[in-house]
Amino acid sequence: MDPSAYLPAVYPVNDYGPVMKGLAIGGLGIFHVFLAQFAIGGGFLMWWFEWLGITGREPLADRLVGSVFRVLILLSFVVGALTGVGMWLTSIQVSPQTIGLMVDEFHWIWATEWIFFWLEVVAGYAFFRYRDHLAPRARLALLAIYSVAGWGSLFWINGILSWQLTPGAWTETHSVWDGFFNPTFWPSLLFRTVVCLVLAGLGAAIVINAMPGLSREERTRLINRCSLFLLPMLAMPVLGGWFVMAMPADSRSWIMGGSMTMTMFLNIAAGASALIGGYAVIGLWRQRLYINGATATLLAALAFGATAGGEFVREGVRKPYSVRETLYSNATTPAQIASLRETGVTVHDPYPLRDRADYPSEQLALGRLVYRNQCAICHTVSGTNGLTELMGGWSLGQQRMNVAKLQWTKGFMPPFAGTPGELEAVVQYIRWEHAKRPADWAESRDPAVLAEIARWLEEAGTAPAPRAQELAREEVSR
């Protein structure tokens, strides 16, 4: 084994203050995913309406395609592109180890995806610029290229993202294709494809209501045509169930009540989707109702809520990993845990504290460094998901034991990676912060306390939560 495997990679420090780092990238990511999926589905919707216009089935098709594409250009090619760049920027700041591993393993997949994205942008701008000068068949072909390229971009990205949860045989072979075509690849891809179509139908309904010069009957006819893009929602329960059953057993347990937060967000996503699907099937398709702009916008807002809930669940069920069995959510690897419990995690951190003078003792400064290396990716001190609130109700003994046995305390947490002295330092630091940072704070270096912490660390071990291991063994035995 390469000795460097036991040393953590250290990157420059970024601090978002009271905003949790994961929340910063998560919020931006949800917005970007929502826009990107609308753009992909919008391509197929425009191609279909262009075909309806060419074949004489819909006299207003040309107007609708032009209106939808103007919105698509603004949202996808401008806002979507900006948020896409923002995703890369925040990713390399929040979890550079994770994004670095993804690029190392799938650099040719990323390169292929960028080619598809480039093709999508070129085809889209060519259609926007030369649409009025092209023959109908040429416009149809250009929209087909745009649609297929957009979906192709989703195809490649989906493989990388689903690999984080279910790397499959990649953990043994490290083959790109074993990692890419992983157990959740197909259910995830098909589910996202349905979402793309649904968002396109809802977005088009909003655009139709904003188009001037249309009669009520014309708007109703166009909206009813767009409602066909919502019918694939009928497959969502099957695809969602397929995805859930393809998850590792411990990940599945988080959304089945093991984690109240993840279960709640799953219910939000499922509930919002059910409301949209019910309205689409019964109201728009069966009864062929007209919906005004306010109702269409409300349905789109529900779709955004469903997207947010689904993306939160997708991120959350990977816990305690960022890449399953390879990289923990706090950017340490399973191979590093035992080593760091001997050497300490802070000895590898070359960056000094910018506010060192604010800490009354060396122990508190050390605790801040431990927090920065072990906790800051997913927690703040006193803000969102703040440790002072999460640990404030525990006694001092409980704080020490619960952090030492972290993966037992919360099954979705990684094992603590550090020495007993570092663990005591971070506990004292959180207590000091909870006490509103007093000017004086006694150091805690009782050998008996450190020995007890060492015993707890030994009892907890360096593996994930016992329940997770038990579920994994049961799954293998089946």
Language model features with spans:
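Short, low-complexity, Pro/Ser/Thr/Gly-rich segments in the mature regions of secreted, periplasmic
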Residues: 451-477
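Sequence context surrounding c-type heme c attachment/ligation sites in exported
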Residues: 314, 318-339, 361-376, 384-398, ...
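C-terminal partner/receptor-binding element of secreted or periplasmic proteins
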Residues: 446-450
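Electrostatic cytochrome c docking/interface patches
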Residues: 339-370, 472-477
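Polytopic transmembrane helical bundles with strong interfacial aromatic enrichment
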Residues: 1-350
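Alpha-helix capping/termination and helix-coil
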Residues: 211-214, 374-382
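Extracytoplasmic electron-transfer domains, predominantly the class I c-type cytochrome c fold
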Residues: 377, 382-442, 458-464
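Extracytoplasmic/periplasm-facing segments of secreted or lipoprotein envelope proteins
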Residues: 359-361, 368-374, 455-465
